[in-house]
């Protein structure tokens, strides 16, 4: 028993240098989200469905080892109305979205470098949420209905950016994220006889500040 306890203590002490070697950061970013669109096909033709470009915010907690690998847990929120367009006719509905994901980062320079370009990839979940007021009549209802509901979807996250060390504990960075999800059919609901598929891309350029320790 004494030998077992000693091994546990020694193993725990052996992990201390590895934990101290990690450099942690907490940060926040603000930017804008720009969505791609998908066509809703119906017997009478097709309409373009998308989410309006709007402001986006993000917070994260990350860690970086002494090498070039790192990772971060992020939470993002974004405004953006649901939109349907065909010719000169448009339907819109108030909406927003939020997501949570984990990204693995690879840096092109070591931890001590003052400038660190990086790329990242990860996965998580995204919730699209209608916040508008449903009306008895909606333009382009024969293609899709924009609803006050929510749709939880899986999400793939891709990223690239550059980190700049302003001081020993302050970091500025510019970054671009590409968030991909299946089309949210529970909030942009195809009409009977209509169909829509594929994925939406949400491209989010942003500027950020982080505190490192």
PLM regions: where:
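Cleavable N-terminal export/targeting peptides
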Residues: 1-23
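Short glycine/proline- and aromatic-enriched beta-strand/turn motifs that initiate or cap beta-hairpins
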Residues: 20-64, 71, 130, 204-213
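Transmembrane beta-barrel strands of outer-membrane/channel proteins
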Residues: 28-32, 73-77, 119-125, 162, ...
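Flexible, solvent-exposed coil segments and beta strand-coil junctions
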Residues: 35-41, 78-87, 133-143, 184-190
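Extracellular loop and loop/strand-boundary signature of outer-membrane beta-barrel proteins
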Residues: 42-48, 84-93, 141-148, 190-197
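Short sequence motifs at beta-strands and strand-loop junctions characteristic
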Residues: 49-55, 94-99, 148-155, 197-201
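Predominantly the C-terminal beta-signal and adjacent terminal strand-loop region
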Residues: 80, 167-213
